[in-house]
Amino acid sequence: MVTATASTPFSLSSSVVFTRRRNFKRFPVCASLSPEVSPLLRAAHHTVDNYVKSGMIIGLGSGEASDFAIRYLGQQLGSGSLHNVVGVPMSARSASEAAKYGIPLEYYRDGVQIDFAFHDADAVEENTLIAVIGRRRSSQEDDYILKQKSIVKVADEAVFMIKEEQYKAGLEGSIPVLVQSLNWLAIAEEIDDLYLGDAEVWRRASVENEGPLGGDFPIVTSDGHNILDVIFTTPIRSLADLATSLDKIDGVVDHGLIIKTRCTVVIAEETVVRSVTLQTSALEGGVRTYGQTLQK
């Protein structure tokens, strides 16, 4: 049993208890792929083969692994291995990839039923499987953080695809925070005071090298929000506590932390694909983590 307690300047006073049990298994996967292929390609094939079923509505993520998964899903539909699958794209990139490979699309709206979603996470906290999304990849992705998070959260089940080094405890680096643009500076100062000594706060700019204030060309999303990158230079002890504390700040619209109770992380290592699944247990009142190591 692991107890996350208030041990850092940004932890809350309440404790979160996680109960976990591991059951590792090894068996062959992706037999049609050679050992030289990208680890993320193997992870993408494993995700489609093991989680996508005919008749599903699928949230189509964004990123390198998601591109591989979308392409493979299109091939499976074209060959007849899968049928009646509809994709809900999380970005213009995933919509374009899906259209290229012949996947029927339905665009996201409130109330749409999504059976399963996959997405590239920027990082995942070990054991809790809390994911970080929305770190800067390209300026075209900045406008889709809220949509990506919404689709993953409403899906009945989700998979985050990552590389081995992206899965660990004590994550560092940027946590994107969407804020009201009119009073962004006051919000940034409050966040900076809250994590003084642990993080820097930069307003994301649409061009490079604009400094912490975002210069003359800050990112403004289609909903009128600025994006603050809260860049942690020391390990974050609890992403759950961090998410709760950010949610309490006036003017914070949302952030790139996803706490999903039914999710799996598919970890692409050099020679194997490993999966870790999170499920809630009403009887135990906590979280159980199951692991499987899938040998290439």
From Swiss-Prot:
Reactions catalysed according to its record: aldehydo-D-ribose 5-phosphate = D-ribulose 5-phosphate
Compartment(s): Plastid, Chloroplast
Transit peptide: 1-30
GO biological process assignments: pentose-phosphate shunt, non-oxidative branch
Pathways per UniProt: Carbohydrate degradation; pentose phosphate pathway; D-ribose 5-phosphate from D-ribulose 5-phosphate (non-oxidative stage): step 1/1
The entry's keywords: Chloroplast, Isomerase, Plastid, Transit peptide
EC number per UniProt: 5.3.1.6
Consequence of gene disruption: No visible phenotype under normal growth conditions.
The keyword DNA repair belongs to this UniProt entry's keyword annotation: no
GO cellular component: chloroplast
GO molecular function: ribose-5-phosphate isomerase activity
Similarity section: Belongs to the ribose 5-phosphate isomerase family.
Protein name, as recorded: Probable ribose-5-phosphate isomerase 4, chloroplastic
Organism: Arabidopsis thaliana
